């Protein structure tokens, strides 16, 4: 991996609303991007993905670049989010994993013993297919549009590995945490360099910001999160701090964990739709001081029609403004409180972006 702190390929963006907001400056308009904005809600996505598996498409530079750019062209969002998947770094390291349609990532072999952990491959090289894809994306983005890279946090990766795939209850994961804490911590230690090196691939290729996704952290108590998860997410964010790009931290169902998660060290905290933004800001500021907020429209509102959608967007923007006025937040990036739902009508997303920018 490159040891260069600020890559030569990094763009200098002086008028990108998302980066201005992430740095606590006043943007020219409310920046917005949506988690899963590149995906099944877009007919053009379904067309280019036809006959190609999800994971394979993440390792095809021209295709991943095209998919990344589709929602930017269509919706006028203020950022592209790299088309990838949480398990891509595992696949790149040599872990046997496939994304099964209708189910999600499924491991060839679950990781449940210390021997399994010791044999778990570690990503120690650049993922060149991703680097090449980022280069193509950067050639098309304007200087007002940021490129966000991302990686899954080690807890979420560990859960997929231990459970062998998606889980409704994460019972094997929680059992390992409590019954075999040394084994659990060994697994988390093993995953940290894989996550860091996947982020460094993206940083060296020139991304403008990054998000650490902890999709399943909301299944944990605050005590378990603080003791068994937080130290590893903190280390990952510390490892990339030197590159001087905004770091976003997000998990689903993490309203009760926002204070704890904020201690990991990101500049921006993602909030899901279950917690009002001004209340979320209070929880974050009480622990870590004011941060930039990201969120938090319920994805289901994209099915509700113009009037309810406009009302909810204005409510959320009002909560963000109140949090900033109270000194509990330093900025706001508009997003959903989770990913775009697969059956969302693409035109509804475009309308939401227009309302966010106009109001």
Swiss-Prot record:
- Record key words, sorted: Cytoplasm, Decarboxylase, Lyase, Porphyrin biosynthesis
An example Gene Ontology CC term for this record = cytosol
From the UniProt record, give one GO term of the biological process aspect.
Answer: protoporphyrinogen IX biosynthetic process
The protein's enzyme class: lyase
Q: Could you say which residues are annotated as the site Transition state stabilizer?
A: 85
Reaction catalysed by this enzyme: uroporphyrinogen III + 4 H(+) = coproporphyrinogen III + 4 CO2
Q: What EC number(s) would the UniProt record show?
A: 4.1.1.37
One GO molecular-function entry: uroporphyrinogen decarboxylase activity
User: Subcellular location, in the record's words?
Assistant: Cytoplasm
Record InterPro entries: UROD/MetE-like_sf (IPR038071), Uroporphyrinogen_deCO2ase_HemE (IPR006361), Uroporphyrinogen_deCOase (IPR000257)
Q: What span is annotated as the signal peptide, if there is one?
A: none
Q: What highest taxon heads this organism's lineage? A: Bacteria
Biological or metabolic pathway of the protein: Porphyrin-containing compound metabolism; protoporphyrin-IX biosynthesis; coproporphyrinogen-III from 5-aminolevulinate: step 4/4
**Residues that bind substrate:** 36-40, 85, 160, 215, 338
Coiled-coil annotation: which residues?
A: none
Query: What is stated as this protein's family in its record?
Result: Belongs to the uroporphyrinogen decarboxylase family.
Q: What does this protein do?
A: Catalyzes the decarboxylation of four acetate groups of uroporphyrinogen-III to yield coproporphyrinogen-III.
HAMAP family, per the entry: URO_D
How this chain assembles, per its entry, is: Homodimer.
Extract the NCBIfam families matched here: hemE (TIGR01464)
Indicate what this protein is called per its UniProt record.
Uroporphyrinogen decarboxylase
Q: What taxonomic classification does the UniProt entry list for its organism?
A: Bacteria, Bacillati, Actinomycetota, Actinomycetes, Mycobacteriales
What is the name of the gene encoding this protein?
hemE
